[in-house]
Amino acid sequence: MQISLSSAQPQAWSGTVLALGIAEGDPNGWIPAMEERFSISLGDWLEQRKFQGKNGESASLQLLNPNCESLVLIGLGPLEALDVNSFRQAGAAAARASKNQTGSIGLLLPWNAVDPAEAVTVAAQAVRLALYSDQRFRSKPEPSIHPERLELLGPLPNTLSSALEAVHPICAGVELARELVAAPPNSVTPSALAESAAQMAHEHGLDLKVLERSDCEARGMGSFLSVCQGSDMDPKFIHLTYRPSGPATKRVVLVGKGLTFDSGGYNLKVGAAQIDMMKFDMGGSAAVLGAMRSIAELRPQGVEVHMLVASCENMINGSAVHPGDIVTASNGTTIEINNTDAEGRLTLADALVYASELEPDAIVDLATLTGACVIALGDEIAGLWTGDDSLANSLEGAAKDAGEGLWRMPMHQAYRKGLKSLLADLKNTGPRPGGSITAALFLKEFVRSSIPWAHIDIAGTVWSDKGRGMDPAGATGYGVRTLVSWVCAQTQQAEN
């Protein structure tokens, strides 16, 4: 999609869909001007539909005018209550109203109600992401009909064009994550994830190292390798690195859970466990791969970014790990596997040990880890666990800037006793109450205490059955925008 600024006023703009933001309490807005332009009684028409400009309201009118085929009015709510997220919602509403039409969208919102650079950027992102459609696996793909151009209208300075330069890289990263999560497990395998990383490395000049099973064995990754014992698919440990063109004063590691399919193992998923949806158990890896796709194009300076994904399947055969087996992670910790369906933390354990060996300034992992987090926070908010207040604040700020829900949860150390094993150093699961907390405490065992580390559980946010806002139904690409925002903030810190 081509995105540009236009100084044209709505009275003179020509295109396919003209979308105007109407604030609550401002009943006239652009309505008189539109009535004059199109010779219609727009006010009466809106009154019949009881349109008041409330947040979430919208009204569309087919004009059959050669210079403007459709008029879309988007309710913004009270003008004084507008925030950056209001512009995301408005952009998504404009996109939804423009589906099945070609040509261009002209979008006019009260850009100066917030930082105009932020407003135009998030609105443009929302339009593009809301128009996303995945037709890859249909024998007869439905034509994806939508406008090819977006013009942001109003008296905006041309300097804001530079703010729009980040729209494509960020959206491309989100779209990659959506594609990876949505694809079936016979398409996205551990090898396919490694191939995706290889393609990215080739196209964007990143460094790539892929550890095969023998390499992981040599490094003592018994925790990770125990998970893939029952699969015919070879595991892949993927290490992708972005290095800035100038000196790097910060190094961060992004770790993503990469279970391309999770049967639960001998603790087989049944009933509400949604075994049919366990293709999305690699949502963490999709998020970090998508973030690296964006970072590679944005080229932030001053920060070196490492991405780690320990990818495999959790399947059942005669060689699969048993409940009760004891394995040894690469830091020497012994783990009693009392639940084979708590496998993600076993793969992350060795990934976090590896991440610590890189001696970074911070480690952030993303994982579809626990159903307990979904019960606690639902499907719009991810959980954040960290013992580092500074890291928590920076991630919460990045998530807010990105428009992604994130809520800090307690690292209640007293629950650590629930991981005690009679035979090994620890068990991989604790009691059912507080399950998302004990999962985070388990992961903490594999991170050097001197390194700031955060765990983000995206089990609820990775998928949307019905769609919401700028996320059509299906994979959301959650986490990409937050990670990119956070990494770019590291650049600013490095400059200071």
Swiss-Prot record:
Record's keyword terms, sorted: Aminopeptidase, Cytoplasm, Hydrolase, Manganese, Metal-binding, Protease
Obligatory cofactor(s): Mn(2+)
One CC-aspect GO term: cytoplasm
Entry-linked Gene3D superfamilies: Leucine Aminopeptidase, subunit E, domain 1 (3.40.220.10), Zn peptidases (3.40.630.10)
Catalytic activity: Release of an N-terminal amino acid, Xaa-|-Yaa-, in which Xaa is preferably Leu, but may be other amino acids including Pro although not Arg or Lys, and Yaa may be Pro. Amino acid amides and methyl esters are also readily hydrolyzed, but rates on arylamides are exceedingly low; Release of an N-terminal amino acid, preferentially leucine, but not glutamic or aspartic acids
One of the protein's GO biological processes: proteolysis
Family: Belongs to the peptidase M17 family.
The protein, known as: Probable cytosol aminopeptidase
Organism: Synechococcus sp. (strain CC9311)
